[in-house]
Amino acid sequence: GTVFSIKSVTGSYSTSVTTGTDGSATLSAIPAGVYVVREESVPEPYIVTNTEQTVALRPGKTSEVTFVDYEKPGLEIIKKNIANGEPIEGVTYRIEQIDGSFSTSATTDNHGRIFLASIPVGSYKVTEINVPSHVILSPIPQEVALKAGETSTVTFFNAIKPSLEIRKLDSVTGDPV
């Protein structure tokens, strides 16, 4: 569950509580007064909100505070053939947080897709680092900002290397030689 700290503004009372599977926690028989409730830790894949709420507790009354948590963002990378829009499998990307605090690499599947779930919020640079032999490497990285609770998509388009077919035919019969 999520861990919350509860502290009186006078400093006379302090405790922590962990929410149950229903997402709630109840404290009973605490002194009346003004308290600051702060989210301290959350289970994966959520992000600590770093917000506090102040609540006044009065004798004989129940007060409630609600915190809304967002999941860590997701990143989808799509790779397509620029000529026909078909997906390209086997392209490897480096995904780096701009501040250097997170880096990973991943390779497109048979649908030309990579999906990274639950990665840190922040700005990222996505760079193509390896392609199949028939694909031309795209040297221009893309930047994307990932926000809590959202999935962002970046799409890369690549050209396929040209091919050449040579035929040798008999001048009289037209049969292959």
Can you name each region flagged by the protein language model?
Residues 1-177:
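Solvent-exposed loop/turn and edge beta-strand elements of beta-rich ligand-binding domains
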